[in-house]
Amino acid sequence: MRTGCEPTRFGNEAKTIIHGDALAELKKIPAESVDLIFADPPYNIGKNFDGLIEAWKEDLFIDWLFEVIAECHRVLKKQGSMYIMNSTENMPFIDLQCRKLFTIKSRIVWSYDSSGVQAKKHYGSMYEPILMMVKDAKNYTFNGDAILVEAKTGSQRALIDYRKNPPQPYNHQKVPGNVWDFPRVRYLMDEYENHPTQKPEALLKRIILASSNPGDIVLDPFAGSFTTGAVAIASGRKFIGIEINSEYIKMGLRRLDVASHYSAEELAKVKKRKTGNLSKRSRLSEVDPDLITK
């Protein structure tokens, strides 16, 4: 959506950081070259991303987002998977569009705590939706054994499975369901970065371990705080991250340990409180009038 950034590439084949526009840079990636995509595009709700305000006409935003999704489908390998997050308001439109291109395998709910002020005239949002989808419903990567969690049986004693001969202790581990409980990243956490929509490392780790293998290429076209990249590299994957904001590019260079022209001081981590949301009136006064929803 935002243009005017001269693209710059950092890194190598194992970890690539691209400072540029997501859609423009996606179009440069070869077809069927990526194993896993995690996309967390703007929600168009007026977030302030280090001075860049997201507030566009709804029809323009949706058209742009659909074009991004189409490009993601093009670059994804036939056995690849894509995860996409967005707001509860936008996800129904995204869901319908993605059905035309992919097979949707899971509709995931990221359920989190919310200590902030909640809505007073409707039910406040306590989750964000995630779609997991694949190109080939019969042939895609899913490593269930890599993401097992403890099953909640409600019993205080070890259960015995008498269906087996001889009887054996009941297996308390299972593949997670589609409601994921991960706390949001807070200021006092070690993983905290100065980004208003930072996602937890644990959430990305589950996605990457489940839907890719060591050596696979993971793409994040809206890299943001580069959590996807940090987790991908730590998990033995290759990574391509696209980001338009220069301050967030610096985060990625530091977190992925990629060489650049920036000094150590410029890349140093300085913790600040999250950038606050703007009110509708405030954000509409700070963006291009041609993009404002009338």
From Swiss-Prot:
InterPro entries: DNA_methylase_N4/N6 (IPR002941), DNA_methylase_N6_adenine_CS (IPR002052), RM_Methyltransferase (IPR001091), SAM-dependent_MTases_sf (IPR029063). GO terms for molecular function: DNA binding; N-methyltransferase activity; site-specific DNA-methyltransferase (adenine-specific) activity. GO terms for biological process: methylation. Residues 283-294 have a biased composition (Basic and acidic residues). Pfam families: N6_N4_Mtase. Its EC number is 2.1.1.72. PROSITE patterns: N6_MTASE (PS00092). The keyword Methyltransferase applies. GO terms for cellular component: cytoplasm. Residues 275-294 are annotated as: Disordered. NCBIfam families: PRK11524.1. Belongs to the N(4)/N(6)-methyltransferase family. This is DNA adenine methyltransferase YhdJ. It comes from Escherichia coli (strain K12). The lineage of its organism: Bacteria, Pseudomonadati, Pseudomonadota, Gammaproteobacteria, Enterobacterales.
